[in-house]
A protein has these predicted regions:
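Hinge/cleft segment of the Venus flytrap/periplasmic-binding protein
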Residues: 282-294
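Basic/polar N-terminal segments that are highly enriched at the extreme N-terminus
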Residues: 1-2, 294
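Phosphate-coordinating loops and pocket residues in cytosolic domains that bind phosphorylated ligands
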Residues: 107, 170, 290
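Short, glycine-/small- and polar/acidic-enriched structural segments
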Residues: 2-131, 137-140, 156-162, 173-178, ...
Length: 294
């Protein structure tokens, strides 16, 4: 008899394909699990589900551990495996611009995702490109409304996670001109989180074994085949768009072979959050990160 396992996403997109493929590709079923997944309500982290016991594994980010640490409290969960080792957001313009530079953002209004981590990363990417983000004509159209606002004519640029930018390209509304992940480089961006108690179980070891297999498959498999497997998870996304998005993330190097969240990657995330003024000190790796169950 299959064992139920509950997985919750904080956000849901093709960017999280390593976890989606673990479900869609049958890797969890091979380990005796019957997976069910959900998406946390907008503005709520999936970490809350771990804390109340309704969720076994959450798609989250190591930075979620910073808020309780800033208050002198230990986080209710730890992050034990990476999903993405680079930011997965893009800058999309209304017209193709093969000579785009970040400096051009000064001359056009840009709709920016104002979620905590996406905004911090955008600020840091601007910094890395010699820009003060405060000098930019930024528009906050709302995370769930910004895509339609751009389609309706608001702004000259938009900052989004895939597959939204690729869908804009497919629809003839925009053209991707830059990658935030490319601007910043490797860091601890998105991850799998669980409680320390759950990570000590055989269930956690079996889950991690399935996740390692899914991740290797994702790296070695053509994007079109991955899109076929994941298509039912994205009923409103054109198959070609899903394929292009997955291929873009493969090429960008978001999905590396190791599942561990490395110390160097974590240190860069601390750099980003210090730059954004969201943390007052550099938190310990061990307070946020755990090693994957063997």
């Amino acid at each position: 008899m299959s064992q139920p396992i509950s997985i919750q996403f904080t956000r849901f997109s093709a960017f999280y394909s390593p976890l989606i493929a673990t479900i869609a590709g049958g890797f969890l079923k091979e380990e005796g699990f019957e997976p069910k997944y959900s998406i946390a309500p907008l503005g709520k982290s999936a970490i809350a589900g771990l804390a109340d016991g309704s969720v076994h594994v959450a798609q989250s980010a190591p930075s979620q551990g910073f808020a309780p640490l800033e208050k002198g409290e230990m986080p209710p969960a730890v992050h034990f495996a990476q999903i993405n080792e680079k930011d997965g957001f893009f800058i999309t313009a209304r017209r193709p611009d093969p000579k785009f530079t970040w400096e051009k953002l000064k001359s056009g209004r840009i709709l920016v995702d104002h979620g905590g981590q996406p905004l911090a990363m955008f600020k840091y990417a601007c910094f890395k490109n010699g820009l003060d983000w405060k000098s930019l004509p930024i528009v906050d159209a709302g995370i769930d409304k910004m895509d339609q606002a751009f389609r309706n004519g608001t702004g000259d640029y938009i900052h989004q996670q895939g597959p939204a930018p690729q869908q804009l390209e497919h629809d003839g509304v925009g053209h991707v001109v830059a990658s935030v992940g490319e601007a910043i480089g490797p860091l601890a961006f998105s991850s799998l989180a669980a409680t320390r108690q759950w990570l000590a179980t055989d269930e956690a070891r079996r889950f991690t074994r399935a996740y390692r297999k899914a991740r290797a498959w994702l790296i070695d498999t053509p994007a079109r085949r991955i899109a076929e497997v994941e298509a039912s998870f994205f009923p409103n996304i054109h198959r070609d768009v899903l394929t292009q998005t997955i291929a873009t993330y493969q090429k960008l190097g978001c999905w590396t072979r190791h599942v561990e969240i490395t110390r160097p990657a974590f240190e860069v995330t601390l750099d980003v959050f210090q730059h954004a003024g969201l943390i007052t000190r550099r938190h310990k790796y061990e307070d946020v990160i755990a090693q994957p169950p063997a």
